[in-house]
């Protein structure tokens, strides 16, 4: 700060000297105004020249940041017409006039009353004018002049950012550009060296350097290793005055991070890994993990693992866990303790991404030996085959041996084995198995035609550890035995035309027949068709075997007549090709029918039966007449019944009700009642229609619902009741249809008591039945009967 004050004082003195020099012409007289005008003659014949009067002044300067006790003298204004008698008044106007700059109106001296800052305002433009003090008449036209604020070095350099962050790859060459920092100085760059900056590094050597003029930071050491040190803190200084003494300075911090390159290979921390796996492990199960360390990061540190050698390459595999960068060794296929107890693997770890610039640092991989021991486990029994197929003939006697399954204990203990059948696969219990030797036998005869294949599951378990068990599928084929005779493939029926000719009308077969056999094809076709031996010479029909498992039935003669015989039953023997063969006799029905001249069937009705019955024409007419008379009687009965105004069954008005119980003798109870009036139930008008209550006046017009089904010819009581119940349940708009039972004696002394829901004794109680009015139309009648009790009492 001392240096700054001394510099300011020197600049002030320099400015004063400049100002004094500026006004020197007035004293010396060579800057006095001269008058330029017309010429006049003096007394002695001299020619006088009139000159224009003007200002005597120059451009003014003022030092910024002046802190003296008195106002700074900026300069002095003077006109050549000023004789010093005080008649001229100087006026100052313009920027800062009267506030920053003041003028002595007599002497013309200008002073700065405030401290000026060039960085806020570099110059001020003012107007000067001389006027007559008494009249304020301008003596000279106004003139403009400038007051410049002269700069001093009062602003230190400032960086654009307080801190910088930069990255540079590790192992970069010397001189690699890292980042450029820039500072600025608010001082005047055109005046002196106040704004001339020079950069230097204060912290960060010897790793980095900075260019003095540009501020570019560069690496200063080769092969900087990120794994040794990743982050550096550098301090950069910017100093004005060209870096000379007395200049002001500013600093900034730069954090430089070394980015990673793949300059390190993966490395296993140990040379041998020991692992173990149980022989009971399943493929895909993890055995263990290995990890090679790579100090690089990101993609440069990615490692992949492979098995490159060893006797366990077929039994084990390795995958890479990219989250943990570990090699996961898994079981590829089952291992057996009794077969091989140890394996050796050579595992390689290699970088995924390799930088060619650092290939000389390689190889970027490492290998390790992994030894895996197999641990013994209590294994379940093993069947000698993955599945079994056995055969047995159908109809074989119970206890017939079907086959055998065999399993053994793979462990060294060789525990005894016990066999059993999964009964979920043999629900009918067709088979049994010897638990000790595994022989499978039948328990009942089998039928191939029902099931040709039977599939069961057999379990084998260790006798000392039932939890150790194995299972195997066993397929049993039921072999066919010729135990089914062939039969007609369809219910065949033949037709033959009646005629007067004695020879057959056609050489075509009456019908072509074929057969089916439930047995296997070996015991089925070829089928042989023939007539039974006893009718081999049938005079009417014959059978010709077509030798293709079909046969044709032919007529041996003509002249068939329906009057003589309209139906023939022809037995046909069918034999199969089994050993021994099976045969059956099937009956073919052949009808004699009427045909046209072309042989087309016209009718095969039952006239022959009527004619052959021996009835005369008169008898037939009598039978038909009786039938007609009976039909006429029935029609008349129905017609008369419909024309009657009243139904056939008449009820008294008070008896027209549904399910009215009538006592033959009073007293007793409901056990003495007749439950139903069968006549009412038999009334056909009440089956599906609506029967109105004659003792109840309907509140609204009721639209009868159609019956659920048409009325039968004869009424069934049970169906009638169920139908009515279903209609009532499904009709929410139906009015209440109460069944009120009236008893002459309520039976207070009866042991059985009353089963009726409406007891007349309750009419004398004090119950309030007005709430029935709110229960809707179904309870309207009850509300009228019980809710108006008081009214009836009053009337009586």
UniProtKB/Swiss-Prot annotation:
Q: Which residues carry this modification: Phosphothreonine?
A: 791
SMART domains attached here?
A: CA
Q: Which residues lie on this side of the membrane: Cytoplasmic?
A: 641-796
Propeptide ranges are 23-53
Region forming the signal peptide: 1-22
Record localization: Cell membrane
The record describes its membrane topology as: Single-pass type I membrane protein
State the UniProt keywords alphabetically: Calcium, Cell adhesion, Cell membrane, Chromosomal rearrangement, Cleavage on pair of basic residues, Deafness, Disease variant, Glycoprotein, Intellectual disability, Membrane, Metal-binding, Phosphoprotein, Repeat, Signal, Transmembrane, Transmembrane helix
Q: What is the effect of changing residue 279 to Q?
A: In TBHS2; results in increased cell migration as shown by an in vitro wound closure assay using patient cells
Q: Which GO terms describe its cellular component?
A: adherens junction; catenin complex; cytoplasm; extracellular exosome; extracellular region; glutamatergic synapse; plasma membrane; Schaffer collateral - CA1 synapse
Instruction: Cite the Cadherin domain residue spans from the record.
Output: 54-159, 160-268, 269-383, 384-486, 487-612
Q: Name one GO molecular function term.
A: beta-catenin binding
Q: Known consequence of changing residue 327 to W? A: In TBHS2; results in loss of cell adhesion as shown by a cell-substrate adhesion assay
Q: How does it assemble?
A: Interacts with PCDH8.
Q: Which PANTHER family match?
A: CADHERIN-11, CADHERIN-23
Q: Which disease is it linked to?
A: A chromosomal aberration involving CDH11 is a common genetic feature of aneurysmal bone cyst, a benign osseous neoplasm. Translocation t(16;17)(q22;p13) with USP6. The translocation generates a fusion gene in which the strong CDH11 promoter is fused to the entire USP6 coding sequence, resulting in USP6 transcriptional up-regulation.
| Function summary | Cadherins are calcium-dependent cell adhesion proteins. They preferentially interact with themselves in a homophilic manner in connecting cells; cadherins may thus contribute to the sorting of heterogeneous cell types. Required for proper focal adhesion assembly. Involved in the regulation of cell migration.
- The molecule here is called Cadherin-11
């Amino acid at each position: 700060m001392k240096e700054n004050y001394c510099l300011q004082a020197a600049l002030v003195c320099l400015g004063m000297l400049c100002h004094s020099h500026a006004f020197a012409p007035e004293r010396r007289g060579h800057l006095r105004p001269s008058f330029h005008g017309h010429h006049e003659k003096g007394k002695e014949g001299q020619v006088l020249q009139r000159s224009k009067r003007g200002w005597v002044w120059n451009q003014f300067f003022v030092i910024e940041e002046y802190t003296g006790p008195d106002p700074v003298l900026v300069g002095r204004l003077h006109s050549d017409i000023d004789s010093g008698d005080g008649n001229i008044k100087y006026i100052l106007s313009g920027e800062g006039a009267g506030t920053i700059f003041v003028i002595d109106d007599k002497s013309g001296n200008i002073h700065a009353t405030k401290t000026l800052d060039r960085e806020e305002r570099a110059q001020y433009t003012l107007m000067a004018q001389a006027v007559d003090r008494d009249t304020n008449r301008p003596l000279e036209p106004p003139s403009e002049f400038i007051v410049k604020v002269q700069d001093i070095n009062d602003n230190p350099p400032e960086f654009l950012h307080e801190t910088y962050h930069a990255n540079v790859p590790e192992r970069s060459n010397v001189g690699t550009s890292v980042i450029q920092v820039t500072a600025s100085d608010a001082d005047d760059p055109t005046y002196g060296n106040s704004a001339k900056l020079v950069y230097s590094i204060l912290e960060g050597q010897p790793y980095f350097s900075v260019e003095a003029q540009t501020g570019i930071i560069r690496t200063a050491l080769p092969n900087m290793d990120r794994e040794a040190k990743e982050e550096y803190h550098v301090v950069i200084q910017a100093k004005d005055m060209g870096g000379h003494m007395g200049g002001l300075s500013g600093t900034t911090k730069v954090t430089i991070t070394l980015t990673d390159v793949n300059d390190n290979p993966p490395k296993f921390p140990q040379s041998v890994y020991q692992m173990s796996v149980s022989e009971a492990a399943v493929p895909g199960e993890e055995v263990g993990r290995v990890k090679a360390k790579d100090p690089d990061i990101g993609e440069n540190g990615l490692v992949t693992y492979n098995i490159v050698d060893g006797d366990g390459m077929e039994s084990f595999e390795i995958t890479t866990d990219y989250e943990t960068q570990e090699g996961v060794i898994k079981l590829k296929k089952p291992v057996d303790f009794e077969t091989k107890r140890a394996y050796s693997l050579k595992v390689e770890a290699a970088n995924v991404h390799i930088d060619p610039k650092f290939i000389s640092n390689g190889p970027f991989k490492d290998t390790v030996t992994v030894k895996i021991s197999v641990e013994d486990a209590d294994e379940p029994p093993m069947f000698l085959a993955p599945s079994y197929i056995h055969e047995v003939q159908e109809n074989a006697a119970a206890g017939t041996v079907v086959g055998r399954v065999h399993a053994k204990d793979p462990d060294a203990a060789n525990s005894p084995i016990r066999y059993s059948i999964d009964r979920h696969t043999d629900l009918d219990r067709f088979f049994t198995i010897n638990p000790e030797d595994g022989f499978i036998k039948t328990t009942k005869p089998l039928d191939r035609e029902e099931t040709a294949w039977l599939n069961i599951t057999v379990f084998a378990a260790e006798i000392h550890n039932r939890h150790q068990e194995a299972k195997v599928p066993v397929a049993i084929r039921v072999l066919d035995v010729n135990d089914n005779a062939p039969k007609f493939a369809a219910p065949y029926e033949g037709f033959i035309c009646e005629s007067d000719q004695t020879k057959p009308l056609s050489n075509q077969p009456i019908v072509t027949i074929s057969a089916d056999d439930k047995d296997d094809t070996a015991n089925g076709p070829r089928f042989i068709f023939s007539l039974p031996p006893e009718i081999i010479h049938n005079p009417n029909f014959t059978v010709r075997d077509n030798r293709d498992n079909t046969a044709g039935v032919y007529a041996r003669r003509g002249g068939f007549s329906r009057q003589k015989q309209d139906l023939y039953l022809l037995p046909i023997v069918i034999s199969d090709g089994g050993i021994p063969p099976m045969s059956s006799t099937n009956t073919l029905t052949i009808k004699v029918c009427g045909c046209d001249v072309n042989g087309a069937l016209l009718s095969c009705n039952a006239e022959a039966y009527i004619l052959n019955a021996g009835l005369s024409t008169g008898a037939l007419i009598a039978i038909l007449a009786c039938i007609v008379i009976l039909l006429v009687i029935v029609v008349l009965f129905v017609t008369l019944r419909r024309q009657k105004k009243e139904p056939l069954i008449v009820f008294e008005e008070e008896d027209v009700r549904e399910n009215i119980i009538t006592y033959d003798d009073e007293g007793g109870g409901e056990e003495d009642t007749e439950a139903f009036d069968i006549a009412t139930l038999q009334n056909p008008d009440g089956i599906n229609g609506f029967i109105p209550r004659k003792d109840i006046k309907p509140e609204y017009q009721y639209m009868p619902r159609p019956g659920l089904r048409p009325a039968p010819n004869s009424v069934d009581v049970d169906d009638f009741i169920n139908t009515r119940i279903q209609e009532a349940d499904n009709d929410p708009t139906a009015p209440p249809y109460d069944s009120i039972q009236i008893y002459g004696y309520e039976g207070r002394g009866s042991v059985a008591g009353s089963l009726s829901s409406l007891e007349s004794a309750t009419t004398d109680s004090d119950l309030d039945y007005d709430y029935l009015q709110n229960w809707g139309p179904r309870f309207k009648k009850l509300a009228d009967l019980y809710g108006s009790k008081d009214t009836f009492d009053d009337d009586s």
